[in-house]
Amino acid sequence: MKFQPLGERVLVERLEEENKTSSGIIIPDNAKEKPLMGVVKAVSHKISEGCKCVKEGDVIAFGKYKGTEIVLDGTEYMVLELEDILGIVGSGSCCHTGNHDHKHAKEHEACCHDHKKH
């Protein structure tokens, strides 16, 4: 099933955290306070045509209580607002698209500025 986020939202498939330590101790869910991570599966047109700070395939970090859970074709996803994304894992900046001659310089600058606040 295809899903197109609206507004400034992204569709994310969660990456599950390890439930055991290297020595085999099981970590209860309530003891985990780390941000969650996931892979971006779809971005809204407003993001893909605007600031382009997040794209499909990016691994992102987001807060534990952010977003809305949905199930599509038996797979659980999160729909997140752009502002709820804490950062892109493995990226030096939100300008990782390499598109430095884009037409939306003001929007891109504002988007990068917003992400630096986090």
From Swiss-Prot:
InterPro entries: Chaperonin_GroES, Chaperonin_GroES_sf, Chaprnonin_Cpn10_CS, GroES-like_sf. CDD domains: cpn10. One of its GO terms (biological process) is chaperone cofactor-dependent protein refolding. PROSITE patterns: CHAPERONINS_CPN10 (PS00681). It is found in: Cytoplasm. SUPFAM superfamilies: GroES-like (SSF50129). SMART domains: Cpn10. One of its GO terms (molecular function) is protein-folding chaperone binding. It comes from the Bacteria. It holds the Pfam family Cpn10. Keywords: Chaperone, Cytoplasm. Belongs to the GroES chaperonin family. PANTHER family: 10 KDA HEAT SHOCK PROTEIN, CO-CHAPERONIN GROES. Heptamer of 7 subunits arranged in a ring. Interacts with the chaperonin GroEL. Together with the chaperonin GroEL, plays an essential role in assisting protein folding. The GroEL-GroES system forms a nano-cage that allows encapsulation of the non-native substrate proteins and provides a physical environment optimized to promote and accelerate protein folding. GroES binds to the apical surface of the GroEL ring, thereby capping the opening of the GroEL channel. This is Co-chaperonin GroES. It comes from Helicobacter pylori (strain P12). The lineage of its organism: Bacteria, Pseudomonadati, Campylobacterota, Epsilonproteobacteria, Campylobacterales.
